[in-house]
Amino acid sequence: MNDVTLDDGTIIELKVAHIDDYQNGGYEYLYSWLSKVDQFLAKRYRVADLVKNKEQWLSRLNTNEITLLGLRQGKIIGSATLIMNDPQSRAAHVASFGVAVHPAFQRKGIGKLLISGLEQIALDRGIEKIEVNCYDGNAAAALYRSLNYASEGRRLRKGRLDNGTYVDELLFYKFINPF
């Protein structure tokens, strides 16, 4: 897609993911930092599951999902995936997304850039509504609100953290192509 210079001078390359981005240690690097932030994600990223998770991740590259990457010096430091419904579905006008940014690069605007890029891709594909969720306490909730995502609800005790405590899931939406 393009190179973007952040406020601190860091240059980030934004691009649509390709299988080559995950070769030569690319996926392993991504996985290593996802495992550090997975308490905020719906999926756990444990070292023992790396091979299985890599196979699943790569198999999704040719489905109704489009992933945008943020790269710094060729390393993946941000990832956002747009998940589109089956085109034959009555919910084909709705998509959802997930986003994660390397801990060292959070709060620098990378998440906002990735989400804005996904919104443009969704618009280009005729998507009207985008949904996203996160666990209560995740700083991403403030990011979604700052991008005009509205609250759609809350699922009580939807997630269970590694320490055994439960956390609610917050649901957000945004109409990007209003009817």
Which role fits each region the language model picked out?
Residues 131-134, 145, 150-166:
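Conserved catalytic-core motifs of GNAT/GCN5-like acyltransferases
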Residues 115, 122-133:
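Conserved GNAT acetyl-CoA-binding A-motif
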